[in-house]
A protein has these predicted regions:
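Active-/binding-site microenvironments in catalytic and ligand-binding cores
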Residues: 1-250
């Protein structure tokens, strides 16, 4: 998306190559006896299931806590608000299955989730949000994941006013979804092309989880669970891969 680099992994050491190169100077006999494999990875920080840090988007040159890029960002990342500052997240998780509430496997392209949609889904699920929840919305977009073009093209997502409801009224600590960008496009605000991101990250200090796999929770109708997830501690980074786990409460 947006010219982001692809994920790449390449083997820096192979069992056969180690015998030839002998990088540890152990000799042919030892290298033939003990095989060695190593690899390197290059990736964009927002690939796969990941969490956005509070420095990912800002407004008027400033991110969360009014930290300015000119003062706190360098060529090796931000010196403040990097994803390495996130502790392990252990909280009550809530799935809001908006697609299922509307009787659809997936919301229509470009559909913008409203507060009414969220309230309808919660009523159907017989669940109430609580302060400090990790709230995960399911537009159902993950069903297109294997088709990258379809997955990324005009996805349904969270509306700006619904995002404000989740934070200001419901008290969500983290907000996420199964789509690429959480929010729907085009923007509802002429002054901001990503208003949900800037509102959550720059104004409210609310991390965002994207590309969350929610299909199994939806299938099993697990709407409340213990959420546990820890991002990789990339110092100064604006996001990092996250491997979340949901433990049903019942």
């Amino acid at each position: 998306a947006a010219g982001d680099p692809h994920y790449r992994i390449w083997m820096t050491h192979t069992p056969e190559g180690t015998v030839i190169d002998d990088p540890l100077q152990l000799g042919t006999t030892m290298n033939q006896h003990v095989s060695y494999t190593g690899a390197a990875v290059s990736m964009y920080t927002h690939m796969g299931t990941h969490i956005d840090a509070l420095n990912h988007f800002g407004l008027d040159g400033k991110i969360w806590n009014r930290f300015a890029a000119k003062d706190h960002a360098g060529d090796r990342g931000w010196r403040v608000a990097g994803v390495e500052n996130f502790p392990p997240i252990v909280a009550r998780g809530v799935l809001i299955d908006v697609a299922a509430a509307k009787g659809k496997p997936m919301l229509d392209d470009g559909y913008r989730i409203t507060r009414a949609d969220i309230e309808q889904a919660l009523q159907r699920q017989k669940v109430e949000l609580q302060t400090g929840d990790v709230v995960l919305l399911r537009p159902g977009r993950m069903q297109e994941y294997e088709n990258a073009h379809a997955y990324m093209q005009n996805p349904p997502g969270l509306g700006y006013h619904a995002a404000r409801y989740l934070v200001e009224t419901a008290g969500a600590m983290v907000v996420g979804a199964d789509n690429l960008s959480l929010e729907a496009f085009p923007s509802q605000l002429e002054s901001d092309y990503v208003p949900v991101h800037t509102y959550l990250l720059a104004e409210q200090g609310t991390p965002i989880i994207e590309l969350a796999y929610l299909e199994d929770l939806s299938r099993d109708q697990v709407y409340e669970f213990a959420f546990i997830g820890s991002p990789l501690k990339f110092r100064g980074a604006d996001a990092a891969p996250l491997r979340p786990t949901a433990f049903p409460l019942d």
